[in-house]
């Protein structure tokens, strides 16, 4: 298991991609791409806009509060444990499996906030990874070599336990 040290948490508050105020604003950027969503609200908003994500990673919460917008997706469901502030091997294995066999929903018992990092590393070039930026909107990261390098750099800050 990898744990994000408390001293480095602020580094992860900056958007890891382009920040949009709403899903509707970024819809044209998703055309022809695999779409991967992290978070219940982002997934719900994509579905409301008519976009079914190829992979959704959800935990039933938004900003630590139970989410009444948890999306209902008809896709293979993988359930994993991932405590807050961590990236577990169970989560990364599920992400790898989901990327190989889309569509899939990964339901996280714990917290899915940091899943965007291993998701970018596992996603094929050209995929669109979206996640919520609390009280600001939605972040879109298009996967390419630079995105994977930045994700690997972020992962290097974590401590193996």
From Swiss-Prot:
| Chain positions recorded as GTP binding sites | 40-42, 59, 112
This protein's source sits in the domain of life called Archaea
Is the keyword Transferase assigned to this protein?
A: yes
Which InterPro entries does UniProt cross-reference here?
GTP-dep_dephospho-CoA_kin
Q: Its catalytic activity?
A: 3'-dephospho-CoA + GTP = GDP + CoA + H(+)
Q: In which pathway does it act?
A: Cofactor biosynthesis; coenzyme A biosynthesis
What EC number(s) is this enzyme filed under? 2.7.1.237
Q: Which GO terms describe its biological process?
A: coenzyme A biosynthetic process
Pfam family membership, one: DUF359
Q: Which UniProt keywords apply?
A: Coenzyme A biosynthesis, GTP-binding, Kinase, Nucleotide-binding, Transferase
- One term of GO molecular function: kinase activity
The answer on whether this UniProt entry bears the keyword Transmembrane helix reads: no
Task: Please give the family membership noted in the entry.
Answer: Belongs to the GTP-dependent DPCK family.
What does the record give as the function of this protein? Catalyzes the GTP-dependent phosphorylation of the 3'-hydroxyl group of dephosphocoenzyme A to form coenzyme A (CoA).
Q: What is this protein called?
A: GTP-dependent dephospho-CoA kinase
């Amino acid at each position: 298991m990898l744990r994000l040290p408390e001293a480095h948490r602020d580094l992860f508050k900056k958007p890891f991609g382009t920040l949009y105020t709403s899903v509707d604003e970024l819809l044209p950027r998703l055309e022809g791409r695999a779409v991967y969503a992290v978070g219940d609200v982002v997934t719900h908003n994509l579905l409301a806009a008519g976009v079914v994500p190829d992979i959704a990673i959800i935990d039933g919460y938004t900003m630590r509060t139970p989410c009444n917008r948890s999306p209902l997706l008809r896709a293979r469901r993988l359930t994993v444990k991932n405590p807050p502030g961590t990236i577990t091997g169970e989560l990364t294995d599920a992400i790898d499996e989901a990327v190989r066999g889309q569509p899939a929903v990964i339901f996280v018992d714990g917290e899915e906030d940091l899943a965007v990092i291993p998701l970018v590393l596992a996603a094929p070039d050209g995929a669109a990874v979206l996640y919520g930026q609390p009280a600001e909107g939605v972040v879109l990261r298009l996967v390419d070599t630079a995105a994977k390098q930045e994700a690997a750099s972020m992962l290097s800050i974590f401590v193996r336990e």
